[in-house]
Amino acid sequence: MLFVFILLLPSCLGYIGDFRCIQTVNYNGNNASAPSISTEAVDVSKGRGTYYVLDRVYLNATLLLTGYYPVDGSNYRNLALTGTNTLSLTWFKPPFLSEFNDGIFAKVQNLKTNTPTGATSYFPTIVIGSLFGNTSYTVVLEPYNNIIMASVCTYTICQLPYTPCKPNTNGNRVIGFWHTDVKPPICLLKRNFTFNVNAPWLYFHFYQQGGTFYAYYADKPSATTFLFSVYIGDILTQYFVLPFICTPTAGSTLAPLYWVTPLLKRQYLFNFNEKGVITSAVDCASSYISEIKCKTQSLLPSTGVYDLSGYTVQPVGVVYRRVPNLPDCKIEEWLTAKSVPSPLNWERRTFQNCNFNLSSLLRYVQAESLSCNNIDASKVYGMCFGSVSVDKFAIPRSRQIDLQIGNSGFLQTANYKIDTAATSCQLYYSLPKNNVTINNYNPSSWNRRYGFKVNDRCQIFANILLNGINSGTTCSTDLQLPNTEVATGVCVRYDLYGITGQGVFKEVKADYYNSWQALLYDVNGNLNGFRDLTTNKTYTIRSCYSGRVSAAYHKEAPEPALLYRNINCSYVFTNNISREENPLNYFDSYLGCVVNADNRTDEALPNCNLRMGAGLCVDYSKSRRARRSVSTGYRLTTFEPYMPMLVNDSVQSVGGLYEMQIPTNFTIGHHEEFIQIRAPKVTIDCAAFVCGDNAACRQQLVEYGSFCDNVNAILNEVNNLLDNMQLQVASALMQGVTISSRLPDGISGPIDDINFSPLLGCIGSTCAEDGNGPSAIRGRSAIEDLLFDKVKLSDVGFVEAYNNCTGGQEVRDLLCVQSFNGIKVLPPVLSESQISGYTAGATAAAMFPPWTAAAGVPFSLNVQYRINGLGVTMNVLSENQKMIASAFNNALGAIQEGFDATNSALGKIQSVVNANAEALNNLLNQLSNRFGAISASLQEILTRLDAVEAKAQIDRLINGRLTALNAYISKQLSDSTLIKFSAAQAIEKVNECVKSQTTRINFCGNGNHILSLVQNAPYGLCFIHFSYVPTSFKTANVSPGLCISGDRGLAPKAGYFVQDNGEWKFTGSNYYYPEPITDKNSVAMISCAVNYTKAPEVFLNNSIPNLPDFKEELDKWFKNQTSIAPDLSLDFEKLNVTFLDLTYEMNRIQDAIKKLNESYINLKEVGTYEMYVKWPWYVWLLIGLAGVAVCVLLFFICCCTGCGSCCFRKCGSCCDEYGGHQDSIVIHNISAHED
């Protein structure tokens, strides 16, 4: 019902009240001028307009508080109206009838000295409410003599109320001159407060928050104190200062003042003294200097450059668009039709591309109540929809409860179901029963039994479905305004067919709109453009500037100099970015618009306290401000702390020289990291876990209080913590992060399966193990493995020595004969070249005896030595086999003997164990007979024990299970804490590694961060980090600082000063790259002094406390204690305790172990040797033939070119000159010549 009255307010209030009271004055229709605006601005510096926070005291504190305060520097409006005996009808309408919104601050003049004798009211009455009728509450503060009568009641406010300073009812039954009530109204508060009647001004602070109304009061221009508060539950929407009717005393004038300014929710900086009194207040968003004060939380901020963040372009106009000349939907005609269906056969009608007035509709159908689902009812006014569908049917008054949202009554179960996910409003209204015909009754005549009529009216229900909010041309006209012109190039507030916001319009030519389309969106759902259906023009919409403003503030200046970064001044002042309408001076720089400073960038300063970046500096001089009235004292200059050519002149190191290794080369590293951010959620049925389905246990569990509730509460907290952390991680991932996946790389199979070891060679300590013998040990290359074949043979100690001797030269075969136990031996394996050589020698010896007999000697020796080598190897293997067989036989005998001894010992042990087991069984039987509480079954306990004992046993079981459950819950809490920390770490790594490139070493992977990717993983995130890791370093002499000319110091910025070829240069800490020292890589210091601080030495106390002896503690505990042992009367004589004697068996086992140890096989060393076999002779023959062919080819080329004949001629002349001409001598028979 409340929504209906609120929504009907704009159309039903012609004046403030609903009833015309008996008036003692006249009224007319003369127009009244608008409320005057004060020349005095709101000044909150001393606390005026603020209030003391309820129930809080602050001493000697400066802190930020958020509340409902006026805007510092704003103006007051005078809402006081005065007359003698005549009222104007225009006084009771806007703008005097004003919106209350968050609240108001009022500065009221006390007129006691100007009112006539006998006057009871010294200032006007104020009323604050919504409907000002007997169906809603109204707050009234009415003066009477020296008190303020405050009340919150359901008053019926008069249509033309006023405040007389000297009441005269003339005998009429008038309660006052502002309300009339036949019977006493319902009141939430009625109290009287005294005030200082001698104070010239009174100050009131009214605001509402969360349905509660607060009132504060002061009689001095300072912070107000608490007056009263009351919970109303309704939203107060309007207030009105009643006209003050009074005839002043002769010779004086009466001009009441009721200055009012609205309140907003704002942040203030307060300063409290030692008595808790507010001495200073600052509105943080009122000016640039105020934001600096709030940013530093100091009323006297220090000199520096501050980044201001609370500045957004203020709109300078309004663009309002609705489709013109749309017909009326006429929804009310269909709602008031004579034929109304029953719930079984409800009807629906859809309205589209038309206008409707919700206020008129509700008034027309005489609505009883209106409530909305998934939308605020007050927001429906003025909105547009794609379409509006209305379902209606008659309903008995007694069954209306079935249609409540979330109810599963009979009507929603069998007839009409309300969709709770849809945006809809539920309307109950009634029509005269004589004008309505109910049709389509249910066959069971259920509705006939309940009936639809109450007090001669038919009860009807309508469900209004609002489809496509702010996306169509079916609009409510309650708050509709006329269309305005589209202002381009400036920041404006817009309402385009129900879509509201602010932005900058720019006209463009676009052909991508269809005839039914008017709005353009981007991929994120933001409005990016629109087509004006009135003019058919198209526009793009860009957001208004919301950027960074740097304020250079000097503590001796009253205001700062400003730098609007990355925008020019024309945009700043065209779009009302600056709070200053007419700044003293401003200009454009390449950093942005500079305000309140002179342009002196052609000048350079060596020192600067206000650095703006990019080598620019703001300088302030108080004398310059006083001398030149057109200057604020600030100027923008160039900052040059030193000249580069002076760096190496008269330079001394500050703090000494140090050797440091700086990386010079890097390699890219890959690191994968998993971080858990979530875990499975757990819920426990505590009662079922502890008691199962046992009723007695569950009943006894109740006595344990809220333990089970606490368990579920803790688990819910754990689950909520997991949800919140997952939402935070998801939020971090959704803001500019794409979950990465491996891109196709054209390689079949995973990348990790590619083996790069053949390209990289042997790496690490496993080279010898993986190199297969001498190839790795002797450094055999991969080419040798490719060109030669390999063969393995047994080596008893001479093969490796032979190989070392030959060094790969096979002609040294017989020279490297080895001696083994006095016998000369050679390896039994021959290469192809060796076989060819020895075969050729043997063949020559056989073909030309006796002259070539000596050629067979190497072959014979080779064969004999190799047979010796083979025999020696076979002999060693045979001896080893004999040793193995003998040792194995000895081991089998020892093992058999050990098994015999073990079997004998186990037999004895078994007999003893069996005997003791029988004795223990007898003991348990006795215990079982004496005590019945053996089983843990609850049912058995209940059936076998009496009530007291059963309860004790159930308590024991419950305590045990609750202890286990408590331990589990504790573990869940600790695990959730770990997950919370790991999720926070994941968010940090998403922000610092994925979204940016961190400067932290080894935080995003190992080394300096390059790139990070994030992938989903079970219960967490998998980060893939790429970083570059140093591989080589440069040792350089570094200095923590330099001293120039003995009085000016320099410190490196993110690096070091190094000596490079006798000159000082700068290099980064991550990479050695000397570069000249400039202001970009260094920081200037005012002196060269170094302050040394020594950290205190702290040692942990490692002494052990002197604890008392356990015996002493037990003696203290047992002191004065008396214990009586129970008489169990057990038959202990039946327990036959047998002592084992296993000495002989253990000795036998020891002998067997000794024999096993003696069976160690000391085999003669037989190694495995790997040798390389070269290619066969025909391969080398082919290679030789190829070489001969190449030589012949070269000779042929020489002959063809003429080079060959020249060479032969020279050779021939040389021989002739040396020996002369001789006849050839031929010897025919060598043997005859010898004779």
Curated annotation (Swiss-Prot):
What are the annotated disulfide bridges? C21-C158, C153-C187, C165-C246, C284-C294, C329-C354, C372-C425, C384-C475, C805-C816
UniProt KW keywords: Coiled coil, Disulfide bond, Fusion of virus membrane with host endosomal membrane, Fusion of virus membrane with host membrane, Glycoprotein, Host cell membrane, Host membrane, Host-virus interaction, Lipoprotein, Membrane, Palmitate, Signal, Transmembrane, Transmembrane helix, Viral attachment to host cell, Viral envelope protein, Viral penetration into host cytoplasm, Virion, Virulence, Virus entry into host cell
Region annotation (Fusion peptide 2) ranges:
800-820
Record-annotated BetaCoV S1-NTD domain positions: 15-296
Q: Which residues form the signal peptide?
A: 1-13
Spell out where the chain is glycosylated: 31, 60, 134, 192, 357, 435, 536, 568, 576, 599, 648, 665, 804, 1091, 1101, 1120, 1136, 1157
Query: Which segments carry the region annotation Heptad repeat 1?
Result: 881-931
Q: Where are the transmembrane segments?
A: 1177-1197
Q: Where is this motif: KxHxx?
A: 1231-1235
Lipid bilayer topology: Single-pass type I membrane protein
**One GO BP annotation here?**
fusion of virus membrane with host endosome membrane
The segment(s) forming the BetaCoV S1-CTD domain are: 327-477
Instruction: Please state the protein's primary subcellular location.
Output: virion
Instruction: Site Cleavage: give positions.
Output: R628, S629, R780, S781
* Protein localization: Virion membrane; Host endoplasmic reticulum-Golgi intermediate compartment membrane; Host cell membrane
Can you summarize the PTM annotation of this record?
Specific enzymatic cleavages in vivo yield mature proteins. The precursor is processed into S1 and S2 by host cell furin or another cellular protease to yield the mature S1 and S2 proteins. Additionally, a second cleavage leads to the release of a fusion peptide after viral attachment to host cell receptor.
Task: Outline the subunit composition.
Answer: Homotrimer; each monomer consists of a S1 and a S2 subunit. The resulting peplomers protrude from the virus surface as spikes.
Report the sequence similarity comment from the record: Belongs to the betacoronaviruses spike protein family.
The free-text domain note is: Fusion peptide 1 (FP1) and fusion peptide 2 (FP2) function cooperatively and have a membrane-ordering effect on lipid headgroups and shallow hydrophobic regions of target bilayers. They are considered as two domains of an extended, bipartite FP. The membrane-ordering activity is calcium-dependent and also dependent on correct folding, which is maintained by an internal disulfide bond in FP2.
The molecule here is called Spike glycoprotein
Q: Which organism is it from?
A: Murine coronavirus (strain JHM)
